[in-house]
Regions:
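Positively charged n-region of N-terminal signal peptides that target proteins for export
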Residues: 1-4
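C-terminal motif of bacterial Sec signal peptides marking the signal peptidase cleavage site
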Residues: 12-15
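Bacterial signal peptide processing site
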Residues: 17-19
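Electrostatic cytochrome c docking/interface patches
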Residues: 28-53, 66-68
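C-terminal capping alpha-helices of c-type cytochrome domains
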Residues: 130-146, 160-189
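Surface-exposed aromatic
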Residues: 152-161
Length: 197
């Protein structure tokens, strides 16, 4: 009788348990399901514009106008590089040894490497308009002129080593933005080696 009573009591306790083993995994709330969105070209270009601005590309690649508060990027020639027709002042020989100097518009620099000129990075064919995205990535990550393997290195002050580990998505966004810019025709002068100054 005692065994029957214990068995009945255990049966009653088991019947009172309302927890049911799930037959399906619990539903994940919609807010936690990662959504894969196809990025639009406009979104890539906007991201690229943002990156170009925060990376300071206009500092060197845009000719300047002089205003009451100093130089500012010329809105008609944004990212078009050193103006082809702009003559440089005489280069101080001391700069070739221990200095790096910028011309007033910040589009030309002189130092032990000679004189370098900021490139035209607009969508014009005299800029990067005929470059592939792969060429652009090679220039940014490997420092090759026009992104062509075996070409001359990009010269100071271009900080390409800072971009060597930039994610593909950011390189692609910058390229998409630059290819959407107003094309500005401007063939930037070739660099001048120190022995020709």
């Amino acid at each position: 009788m005692r065994t029957l009573l214990i068995t009945a009591l255990l049966g009653l306790l088991a019947a009172c348990n309302t927890t049911v083993a799930p037959t399906e995994p619990p539903a994940v709330p919609p807010a936690t399901i990662p959504m894969v969105q196809e990025e639009t070209l406009e979104a890539r270009q906007e991201r690229g514009r943002y990156l170009v601005e925060i990376m300071g590309c206009n500092d060197c690649h845009s000719p300047k106008l002089m205003g009451p508060n100093g130089p500012y990027p010329d809105p008609d020639r944004l990212l078009s590089g050193h103006p082809a027709a702009q003559a440089l002042p005489a280069v101080p020989k001391a700069a070739l040894k221990d200095w790096a100097l910028f011309a007033m518009g910040n589009t030309a620099a002189v130092g032990p490497w000679g004189v370098s000129f900021a490139g035209n990075i607009t969508s014009d064919v005299t800029g990067i308009g005929s470059w592939s995205e792969e060429q652009f990535a090679n220039a940014m990550r490997k420092g090759w002129w026009k992104g062509i393997e075996g070409s001359r290195p990009l010269l100071p002050p271009m900080p390409w080593p800072n971009f060597a580990n930039m994610p593909d998505a950011d390189i692609s966004a910058i390229y998409a933005y630059l290819m959407s810019t107003k094309p500005v025709e401007n063939v930037v002068p070739a660099p001048v080696p120190p022995d020709q100054l």
